[in-house]
Amino acid sequence: MSKNKLSKGQQRRVNANHQRRLKTSKEKPDYDDNLFGEPDEGIVISRFGMHADVESADGDVHRCNIRRTIRSLVTGDRVVWRPGKPAAEGVNVKGIVEAVHERTSVLTRPDFYDGVKPIAANIDQIVIVSAILPELSLNIIDRYLVACETLQIEPIIVLNKIDLLDDEGMAFVNEQMDIYRNIGYRVLMVSSHTQDGLKPLAEALTGRISIFAGQSGVGKSSLLNALLGLQKEILTNDVSDNSGLGQHTTTAARLYHFPHGGDVIDSPGVREFGLWHLEPEQITQGFVEFHDYLGLCKYRDCKHDTDPGCAIREAVEEGKIAETRFENYHRILESMAQVKTRKNFSDTDD
């Protein structure tokens, strides 16, 4: 990881956090500053409890404690940390994370108990992995795309297992993927088994921090293992060889480096993005091809369904918007309403 010089704004934030920590430490003792060396730059490659693994500028990984004044720390955060000094009895003291730089982006997911929960930071792009088996679901792809648009993180759609397609199947799948190509999304067709299409994907990942999203069974872990060039798999397979059905993993989010350049954060928290915390207007904005027609409906409170004078529905009827996308839009709204109803019912039970 290259060592970046702090900007004036970043330095001010680090100093402000440090002063806030010093103020808090007067009220309640934190860690002894004499136990730690000089501040350095680093990136969080994994977080668990009150500890984090921080990679320094020279590529070494250090186990660190986290200052109590740091309110949020996730994999991908760029931090100021200090190494621990050797203790008198020869045991090394853990390092300490002192401050967190401002995030360029934050990947969040809704949580019934904690509201919106951050799971990764400074993501450049989300790689949406789908596959023809167990089944190709455009509805799930559309859910991921809405999440990406809401988070303002660039998506790439990757269709895996293309080696299982014959010519007729490939033509059909390409027709489905053209729906997304035509509205500006990048689509890559790959096979982690034969490694077809991996070179363009590797090029798209170079120099960027990515996170792979996909349901169990799409071959996400196999794809990551192929890209990482691992001799021994360190990412748990997300599909059972015997049944063909997906199985869950419980590992914490962790950042890995691609040999061709670029990084990936592997996290079990992005198998499926919940959208129930969003408002219907945010879902509408999440369909990029709707933008040209928003505000053109006859009624301001148009639900974009059977309402008379709906500009979006008319665009669908004229073939300007894909019917499958329009149908999935309403499926997402319906599923959101159902989840919110269950959540409200559960809250009243408490």
Swiss-Prot record:
Gene Ontology annotations of biological process type:
ribosomal small subunit biogenesis
Q: Where is this region: Disordered?
A: 1-33
How the cofactor is bound: the record states: Binds 1 zinc ion per subunit.
Query: Per UniProt, what is one GO molecular function of this protein?
Result: metal ion binding
Alphabetical list of Pfam families matching this protein:
RsgA_GTPase
Cofactor(s) of this protein = Zn(2+)
SUPFAM superfamilies recorded for this chain?
P-loop containing nucleoside triphosphate hydrolases
* Top-level lineage group: Bacteria
Classification via InterPro entries: G_CP_dom, NA-bd_OB-fold, P-loop_NTPase, Ribosome_biogen_GTPase_RsgA, RsgA_GTPase_dom
Q: Which UniProt keywords apply?
A: Cytoplasm, GTP-binding, Hydrolase, Metal-binding, Nucleotide-binding, Ribosome biogenesis, RNA-binding, rRNA-binding, Zinc
Location of the protein in the cell? Cytoplasm
Which positions are annotated as binding GTP? N160, K161, I162, D163, G214, Q215, S216, G217, V218, G219, K220, S221, S222
Composition bias type Polar residues, residue spans: 1-17
This entry's Enzyme Commission designation comes to 3.6.1.-
All copies of the CP-type G domain together span 104-273
Please tell me where Zn(2+) binds in this chain.
C297, C302, H304, C310
Q: Give the UniProt entry's GO cellular component terms.
A: cytoplasm
Q: Does the keyword RNA-binding apply?
A: yes
What is said about its interaction partners and assembly? Monomer. Associates with 30S ribosomal subunit, binds 16S rRNA.
Query: Which family does the similarity line name?
Result: Belongs to the TRAFAC class YlqF/YawG GTPase family. RsgA subfamily.
Q: What's its job? A: One of several proteins that assist in the late maturation steps of the functional core of the 30S ribosomal subunit. Helps release RbfA from mature subunits. May play a role in the assembly of ribosomal proteins into the subunit. Circularly permuted GTPase that catalyzes slow GTP hydrolysis, GTPase activity is stimulated by the 30S ribosomal subunit.
Per its record, how is this protein called by name? Answer: Small ribosomal subunit biogenesis GTPase RsgA
Recall the taxonomic lineage recorded for the source organism: Bacteria, Pseudomonadati, Pseudomonadota, Gammaproteobacteria, Enterobacterales
